[in-house]
């Protein structure tokens, strides 16, 4: 697990999740789906009040690099036993810079 931060912008403003995290395997489809698992995380913003959400834009900060997130649909789910949260992002179009760890 490494430091991971995702910032998402939607109609409710900017929301973030940050902490220790890593990408999870995702199907090889185009445009890509990004799936991340966070532990020891913190959330900020209104987006986390809903389990499903629309994203206008965003960015991933991972291993010293930044990757854009284009318009997308997202979901999240919490695993109370492992004290973890999984974030799934279904991109509507390809990003300018692909996240290579997925």
Curated annotation (Swiss-Prot):
Highest taxon of source: Eukaryota
Glycoprotein as UniProt keyword: yes
GO CC annotations, alphabetized: cell surface
Coiled-coil regions listed: none
Location of this chain's protein in the cell: Cell surface
Principal subcellular localisation of the protein: other
Modified how: O-glycosylated.
Disulfide-bond pairs as recorded: none
One GO term (biological process): culmination involved in sorocarp development
Keyword entries, A-Z: Cell adhesion, Glycoprotein
Keyword Cell inner membrane included in the entry's annotation: no
Function, as annotated: Cell-cell adhesion during early development.
Family: Belongs to the csb family.
Protein name: Glycoprotein 24A
Native source organism of the sequence: Dictyostelium discoideum
